């Protein structure tokens, strides 16, 4: 644990590789990397964690070793690839994101964590598999280091298991550079990393943390009302006017960099909001946004990022902004359209098709005022264009979703929060402190700003309770917790090399971070048993207490309760005799009751300890039972159905492989039918989501979809009964419009189609493109299946999916990968 000021001068040469003085945590990181150990860096956004990754690349490439850089999202992978290529022109870089593959034999490979996990998992269980491998690197011998950017994704509800399995499966010889936002339990996590290999521990983990920001943050609240409303307040509520008007259209300090929380200013803001509500004063969103933006411009607090946690409001708010954000003498308004065209022309061959898009023209309208938008519903190419403009200092105001805060190195002078709550898939909730700090941390540019500003647009959201507001800005960082669970894939991969070995799988699961929590629970429960046993032993038994007599007495009481009233009356006298025969009955009953409670508590704890110990073996047995029931394992060996399933990752493989066999290798389906079939596993959302099969489809496709639906429900229900995880996601028919896209042949037709799905269905161009690329990836996986089962007809039908879908602006291109 690196807490002392760094004083060693032996690495001065290494430190001098960077043109600025290094912080202590950066120096410790370089020492760890130089000595071949692991490093876990936990620090706020903007603290300089990138230095650690860059040194690791320089160091291990100089040793002739390969480096893998993993990131949580494709957009971050693409940007890192571009940035690192520019920074280190003498080092070769490659990228693998599922959609894009470029230079897979490079010195440094940048990839999503899923791709590395899938490769490691298959290598762990089946070293003979070459069909599905995305890259041919000899991990055991040639890989020197893996850099995990944003390693706090380890706790992500849906994807955390990917990070955990990747860390579990990496060989002990490979150094880890783990970069994370501040976390609450770094020591526990670091110890788990060290102990993964038990007796084969080869490396220590350096834990280097910092709470220091190079550019400190100051957090403000902000309220405004119109001049007319202010005049009304002055006339009708003079005392309130005197009290509040000096705090309107002002930045009221909420928190300094020293973690202090200004309760007085919070109270002022709440009082103003209360007065506005009681006086029925209406402050519309457009007025609030324009007033704040004018203030930011006047106070020289641009560029600014507005985080808007509802995608539909991003464009709405952007077009509310009335004034040009550029300085009066700036020529950027007149040149930015040509700049955008140049960015696209230099990045992609079909740039003219993007220039024709209404979305592009709409974006240009905003850009001419220094304003841009950024969210997942926008085409990746256009999002990247915005990122490039921001990185070159050509934008003044960016309105974006929370995703922009994840990793993308785009600091600004000011960040603005338009809400403190978000929809998380199941309902609205307040932001976690870690989420808030990730967004707030984008404020403050190293080398440009003395302080970064964080503004809360209190006009636009309900204020939290005071203690919640304080915790949001000053709360503990997130605690890393395991999301590990066994999976169908792990069981099948284990069976692909041998017969089912539950002990081996249980041992593998025992290396997970989940085991740390399980062992902690067991230790706590054992301590509770010891405490209860001591307390139990200290109970004072009444002198004349007799177990047999008391048991007989209690049974007689139970018997009386079960008989008729008439019989019960006759038994009362007998009961009284029994009472008279027991000396000190009240104390005997109290002792017996306490004794029973101790026994029950200890028994329950012992039962729970047993359940904890058998967590994984029970889970594994349930997975194996399901795989046997559905025909993936037979006689403890993987069947052909299991072999097929292992080639599928993009969709629930248990369902799709079973469907393939049940529907005779899809022999009755055309290529278009297959595209429609693959389209039902998507994450798109429409104005009116479609969860039922449309009537317009042909009989063969409809019949296949019904079979798929029934199979999906069956597998889901069976998994729920066994309390195991089957898969995420649900079937929907939101992307069946893809059929119409297949007939598009001209740019005009493409624009008409894309306009139609946006206006009629609420399906954005970015979402449509992402879902379309997924269908192509499913087709590629199913092609591997067709090759595996020697089905030439199916392989032929699948071979044209890519060319039918990938056209016009619906592509996997990236401006960062050219």
Predicted regions: what they are:
Residues 1-39, 216, 246, 323, ...:
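Helicase-associated low-complexity/disordered flanking segments
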Residues 20-214, 222-223, 304-308, 316-326:
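Conserved P-loop/Walker A NTP-binding site and adjacent catalytic elements of P-loop NTPases
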Residues 69-70, 78, 85-97, 284, ...:
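Conserved C-terminal RecA-like helicase domain
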Residues 105-121, 369-383, 389-409:
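Conserved two-lobed SF2 helicase motor
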Residues 150-152, 395, 404, 420, ...:
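Conserved Walker B
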Residues 168, 175-177, 182-320, 372:
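Conserved interdomain linker/interface between the two RecA-like ATPase lobes of SF2 helicase motors
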Residues 368, 372, 377, 388-395, ...:
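Non-catalytic terminal extensions of ATP-dependent helicases
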Residues 410, 414-424, 429-469:
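Conserved segment of the helicase C-terminal RecA-like domain
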């Amino acid at each position: 644990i690196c807490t002392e000021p760094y004083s060693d001068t032996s690495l001065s040469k290494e430190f001098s590789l960077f043109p600025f003085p290094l912080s202590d945590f950066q120096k410790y990181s370089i020492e760890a990397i130089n000595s071949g150990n692991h490093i876990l860096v936990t620090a706020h956004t903007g603290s300089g964690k990138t230095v650690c990754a860059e040194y690791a690349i320089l160091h291990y490439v100089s040793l002739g070793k390969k480096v893998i850089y993993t990131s949580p999202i494709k957009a971050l992978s693409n940007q890192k690839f571009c940035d690192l290529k520019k920074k280190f022109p003498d080092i070769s870089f490659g990228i693998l994101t599922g959609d894009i593959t470029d230079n897979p034999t490079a010195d440094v490979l940048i990839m999503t964590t899923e791709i590395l996990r899938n490769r490691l998992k298959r290598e762990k269980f089946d070293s003979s598999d070459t069909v599905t491998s995305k890259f041919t690197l000899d991990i055991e011998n040639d890989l020197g280091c893996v850099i995990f950017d944003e390693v706090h994704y380890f706790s992500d509800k849906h994807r955390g298991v990917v990070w955990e399995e990747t860390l579990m499966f990496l060989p002990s010889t490979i150094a880890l550079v783990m970069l994370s936002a501040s976390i609450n339990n770094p020591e526990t996590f670091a110890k788990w990393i060290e102990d993964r290999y038990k007796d084969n521990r080869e490396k220590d983990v350096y834990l280097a943390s910092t709470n220091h920001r190079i550019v400190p943050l100051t957090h403000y609240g902000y309220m405004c009302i119109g001049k007319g409303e202010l005049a009304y307040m002055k006339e009708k509520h003079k005392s309130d006017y005197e009290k509040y008007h000096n705090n309107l259209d002002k930045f009221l300090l909420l928190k300094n960099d020293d973690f202090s929380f200004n309760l007085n200013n919070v109270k002022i803001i709440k009082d103003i909001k209360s007065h506005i509500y009681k006086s029925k004063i209406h402050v519309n969103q457009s007025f609030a946004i324009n007033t704040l933006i004018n203030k930011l411009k006047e106070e020289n607090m641009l560029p600014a990022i507005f985080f808007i946690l509802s995608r539909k409001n991003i464009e709405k708010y952007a077009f509310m902004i009335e004034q040009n954000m550029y300085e009066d003498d700036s020529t950027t308004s007149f040149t930015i359209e040509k700049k955008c065209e140049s960015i696209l022309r230099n990045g992609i061959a079909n740039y003219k098709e993007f220039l024709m898009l209404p979305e592009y023209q709409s974006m240009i309208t905003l850009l001419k005022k220094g304003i841009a938008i950024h969210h997942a519903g926008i085409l990746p190419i256009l999002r990247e264009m915005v990122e490039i403009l921001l990185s070159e200092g050509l934008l003044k105001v960016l309105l974006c979703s929370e995703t922009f805060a994840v990793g993308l190195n785009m600091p600004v002078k000011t960040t603005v929060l338009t809400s403190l709550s978000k929809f998380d898939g199941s309902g609205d909730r307040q932001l976690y402190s870690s989420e808030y700090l990730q967004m707030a941390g984008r404020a403050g540019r190293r080398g440009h700003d003395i302080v970064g500003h964080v503004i809360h647009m209190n006009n636009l959201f309900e204020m939290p309770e005071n203690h919640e507001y304080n915790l949001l800005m000053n709360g503990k960082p997130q605690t890393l917790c395991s999301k590990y669970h066994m999976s169908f894939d792990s069981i099948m991969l284990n069976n692909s090399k041998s017969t089912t070995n539950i002990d081996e799988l249980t041992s593998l699961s025992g290396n997970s971070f989940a085991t740390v929590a399980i062992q902690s629970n067991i230790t706590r429960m054992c301590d509770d048993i010891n405490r209860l046993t001591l307390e139990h032993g200290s109970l004072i038994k009444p002198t004349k207490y007799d177990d047999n007599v008391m048991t007989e007495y209690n049974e007689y009481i139970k018997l009386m309760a079960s008989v008729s009233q008439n019989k019960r009356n006759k038994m009362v006298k007998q009961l009284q005799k029994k009472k008279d025969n027991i000396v000190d009955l009240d104390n005997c009953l109290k002792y017996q009751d306490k004794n029973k409670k101790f026994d029950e508590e200890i028994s329950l704890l012992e039962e729970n300890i047993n359940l904890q110990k058998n967590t994984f073996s029970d889970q594994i047995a349930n997975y194996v039972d399901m795989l046997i029931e559905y025909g993936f394992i037979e006689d403890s060996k993987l069947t052909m159905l299991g072999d097929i399933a292992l080639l599928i990752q993009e969709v629930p493989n248990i369902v799709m492989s079973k469907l393939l066999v049940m529907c005779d290798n899809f022999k009755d389906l055309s290529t278009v039918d297959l595209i429609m079939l693959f389209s039902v596993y998507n994450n798109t959302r429409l104005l009116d989501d479609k969860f039922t099969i449309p009537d317009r489809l042909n009989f063969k496709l409809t019949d296949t979809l019904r079979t798929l639906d029934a199979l999906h429900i069956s597998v889901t229900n069976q998994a729920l009964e066994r309390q195991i995880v089957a898969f995420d996601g649900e079937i929907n028919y939101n992307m069946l419009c893809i059929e119409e896209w297949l007939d598009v042949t001209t740019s005009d037709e493409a624009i008409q189609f894309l306009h139609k799905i946006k206006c009629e269905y609420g399906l954005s161009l970015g979402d449509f493109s992402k879902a379309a690329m997924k269908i192509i990836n499913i087709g590629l996986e199913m092609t591997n299946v067709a090759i595996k089962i020697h089905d030439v007809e199916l392989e032929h039908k699948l071979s044209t999916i890519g060319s039918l879908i990938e056209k016009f602006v619906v592509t996997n291109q990236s401006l960062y990968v050219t």
